Amino acid sequence: KDSAILIGDSAHATVPFYGQGMNCGFEDCRIFDNLLDQCTNDLENCFEQFSKIRKPNGDGVQDLSMHNFIVMRDKTADPLFLLQKKIEKKFSNLYPDKWIPLYSMVSFTNISYSEAWKLGQKQEKIMHEVMRTPDIDKIWDSEEIMQKIDSFL
């Protein structure tokens, strides 16, 4: 129970469609190092805490990677998907404290993978409703649409 622990790709092997394998492994090392400092001479407890902390994030990076694969495979040529991304970008530029695009959350913040996945799913539900707006392709950059997104937050 206290003689070995898996970190990096051996602990959370995933498809390569988010490019986060090495980053996730470095994060494992940082967190494990902090836990070693806290759990002096109690490796079993250290390993248990590490697993409790990292398992949800290993699952999160897997979910994010599979989602990104599906997006790259199925959606990048879809005009409605591209419009949705333009709307999200505009809202994020106007209200960066209220909306961080999923890719930016994962790649440029310290938000955990599991939390980014949850927030990304919430954002997707909001955008699903926004994209159902009549004539969204004509009014996408209007204040009305920005207020609609804000009202869901």
What are the residue ranges of the model-derived segments?
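C-terminal helical "tail/cap" subdomain of flavin- and related membrane-associated enzymes
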Residues: 34-153
